[in-house]
Amino acid sequence: KNDKRDGQGTLIYSNGDKYVGDWANDQISGDGIYSYKNGDRYDGQWKNGFIHGKGTFSNSAGDVYIGEFKNNKMSGWGNYIYKNGNIYEGKWKNDKRDGQGTLSYINGDKYKGKWTKDKRIGDGTINFVNGSTYDGEWKNDYIDGYGTFNYSNGDIYEGEWKNEKKEGQGTFTYFDGDSYEGEWKSNIKNGIGAFSYINGDKYQGQWKNDKRDGTGVINYANGDKYDGHWKNDYIHGKGIFTSLAGGNYIGEWESDMKDGHGTFSYVNDDIYKGQWKNDKRGGTGVINYANGDRYDGNWKNGHIHGKGTFLNSAGDKYIGEWEKDIKEGQGKFIYSNGDR
């Protein structure tokens, strides 16, 4: 028309591409099909020589896009069916997923949320085929920021993330009722945190590599309390143990047992100060009894054992050998009046 292509027509390009469809004022405009030599194909609307409007684009790799275009770019709303079986439905901008959209993975996982320049960025929810779900913030296609992860086994984590790992402050509630609230690093408890056990025990203190490590306090459900050092999840180092029933221990520990030097004040007012081994008095130590008696010497497996001196409240003294709290072996007894 007026020496210009107008209406229906076919153009075969020198590079092997082919267009069949509408023309207006010498430009491709309207509805048409463009077949590329490399196997790509577009069927849809055109405007002033550009793919513009609604249409379907399929590439030689096997991917298919059905949706809106603007100036030769996927822009607006559209569905993208990937060769591998994944399907995206949502907003596009300049050939990239951008805005709200849903990606359904071939394995059954499904993400619904915000996209920016082809990456999950902002708020989004992913439902995993195994039953787990995450709802929260994303950055550069990774779980990153603040969000809640519901695990398929019933565990729940709510808190901060970085590069798909628990990092920063967060609360983990275990399916069995235990819970941890505190600091995380690379998916493990690390820093300061509080752990509440289903049995009623509560620990507050330092963590390292997912274990109680450093200084911390545990309040037991029965009213007992320990305040001191920990290592590899065990009471280890120096600390104070207080029993609700009465009595307390101040001293050294190893692997949850009194081990080293320490002082135990008993509920009956006896006081032992000395060495411990495997949670029992062992080595050398002194015990001052509430009735005024006193023993200073060797101990083994919690018993007076070996050599030692016993002084009773009356002033009588025994110096010699013992076996399991009984005077046994060589020894001498000195009475308060000087008799021997």
Regions found by a protein language model. Give the residues of each.
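Conserved anchor residues at repeat-unit boundaries in beta-strand-based tandem repeats, strongest
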Residues: 1-6, 18-29, 41-52, 64-75, ...
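Intrinsically disordered, low-complexity segments enriched in Ser/Pro/Gly/Ala and basic residues
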Residues: 13, 28, 34, 57-59, ...
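Functionally constrained cores in energy, signaling, and assembly domains
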Residues: 24, 31, 50, 59, ...
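Aromatic (phenylalanine/tyrosine) cluster motif
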Residues: 50, 69, 128, 142, ...
